[in-house]
Amino acid sequence: PQEYLGTFLLISVVSLLGAGVLLGLRPPAPITSHRDTAEARPLPEIIRQPTYLVAVFGAATAYGVMVLAMTATPLAMVHHNHEMASAATVIQFHVLGMFLPSFFSGSLIARFGNLPIMLCGVGLLTAHVLISLSGTEMGYFVSALALLGVGWNFLYVGATTLLTGTYTVAERGR
């Protein structure tokens, strides 16, 4: 609806400003030891690695699914005659799902590996979609968005952790 247009435009402007600031940042040169002085590979060579592609695709998928569902849910809830306070509660459960697992997702990755945790995230995101399509009562929205948060955490944290293994110290910041 048009009543939310101003909010989305404001968020777009803030996002563009943030991107502009980030593009202007230059990370400091990494501190290297004599073991890290190997010549850096060209960026296209780094990007063509299958592991790199899996990591980037996983992180982008997690982010895309999360943003789409998180922004659409309050609109769907209002459309189905839920109070805005109920939509806020659903988003609170979602945010808990996104960040609470961070206390242990790193340990799970260390124990089971990146790919199993990423696949678990994909499974949770799939469960989110199935629950979202199953009904419009409050319980469906809460459980779907909570699963979305945990699925995002597992897939995004797993993917970005996987990404850190695709380059050397000399190749950071490219």
Q: What does each of the following model-derived ranges do?
A:
Residues 12-33:
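C-terminal membrane-cytosol helix-exit motif in multi-pass small-molecule transporters
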Residues 27-56:
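Juxtamembrane intracellular "pre-TM" segments in multi-pass secondary transporters
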Residues 48-69, 146:
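Pair of pore-lining "gating" transmembrane helices in MFS-fold secondary transporters
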Residues 71-90:
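Short amphipathic helix-loop junctions that connect adjacent transmembrane helices
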Residues 100-114:
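Helix-to-loop junctions at the C-terminal end of transmembrane segments
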Residues 116-131:
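Structural signature of the two symmetry-related core transmembrane helices
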Residues 133-144:
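Helix-loop junctions at membrane interfaces in 12-TM secondary transporters
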Residues 154-167:
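Intracellular juxtamembrane helix-capping segments at the cytosolic ends
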